[in-house]
Amino acid sequence: MPTQPILVASIADGTGKTAVTLALARLVQERDRRVGYMKPKGTRLQSSTGKTLDRDPMLARDLLGLDGEMHQLEPVVYSPTFVDSAIRGQEDPDELGDLVESQFRELATDTDLMLVEGGGDWTTGGIVDLTDVDVADRLDATVLLVAPYRTAEDLDNVLAAADAFGDRLAGVLFNDVSDAAFDELESDAVPFLERRGVPVVGVLPHDRDLAGVTVGDLTAELGADVLVGGDTDGHIERFLVGAMGGDAALRYFRRTKDAAVVTGGDRPEIVTAALEAPGVNAVILTGGHRPPAAVLGTAENRGVPVLLATGDTLSVVDRAESILESGRARDAGTVDRMRDLLYDHADVDAILSGDDAASDADE
């Protein structure tokens, strides 16, 4: 018999939920247990039409060697088209909930533990009664809540989610915690939550390998043209908009690291300033303009990639931020790194306690 499923929910999109879910699945497999995976609401789509699939279940199927079909792993494609249909009364919440349950039962066959990944944040799906709270109730799942932490004010959201999940909450896992916030979280915030009856099962530090996106991945996601090649493994954690004068831009750019500068191709002085800043790992040009050949030559000499993306600066920044905030687990390497972080900084036995009990019963 499978043990009680674990639903991995998150306070906000882009908190590393997919990496955590898949890393836990790998840990279960390393214990010689049979694991299953499901993401009831597909939210990370390649298009907004609902005709494409969520990338997370596709990655899960490949990494975990699962046999389930995509319509089982992701029964509800939560696209803008679907949302529009739902608010017009064209989607039946009861039928959708029953669909999730039936696909879950099929996937759970011959598994020891099912891991269920929430979609978006924990409130996503409310228009069709499929929030993570609703899904946990339907599947009788315990809940691991993945949360960010920057300041103590973030605890308001944690407490609200903990109250909504109630007794189903197995624990909170803080992820991607900066050095500046780490001590305060461990010394003050964690004891506060535990006094309020909210268990904390881990605090994972910021890890460069899991944050941001590589220049190569960003280029592919944006569909950008490469004007100047360079270090495609360069790391991007933030985007800076170049809209000021050259001198001011240089002072601005020098205060950052692991950044990409987004600016119009008709602003060569901004591009030049970006190329002089050691923390800028790429320049993204917009508006269909190319800078002078001399500027591109400087970029080539410095090994800084220069990309040309379709659209104006605002739209390109929005798309780039969306890529960055997806927090996606890109490959086996990122999942394995998350597994190591869980080993070092989380109580894995507490998270997987139901599966351990099942394993002991089988022996």
Walk through the language-model features, giving the residues of each.
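Conserved catalytic-core segment of NTP-binding enzymes
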Residues: G120-G202, D266-G303, L307-I323, G327-A329
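Terminal disorder- and signal-encoded targeting elements
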Residues: M1-T3, E363
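Phosphate-binding/switch loop-helix module in NTP-utilizing enzymes
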Residues: V83-V128, V133-D137
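N-terminal phosphate/diphosphate-binding loop that engages ATP/GTP or pyrophosphate donors
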Residues: P5-T15, A19-E106, A181-D183, A189-R195
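C-terminal accessory "lid"/substrate-recognition subdomains
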Residues: G171, N175-V271, L275, R328-E363
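P-loop NTP-binding module
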Residues: P5-V8, D98-G118, V241-G245, A249-R254, ...
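Fold-independent oxyanion-binding glycine-rich loops
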Residues: S10-A12, L24, P40-K41, R55-D56, ...
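Structural motif
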Residues: P5-L7, R34-G36, M58, M70-H71, ...
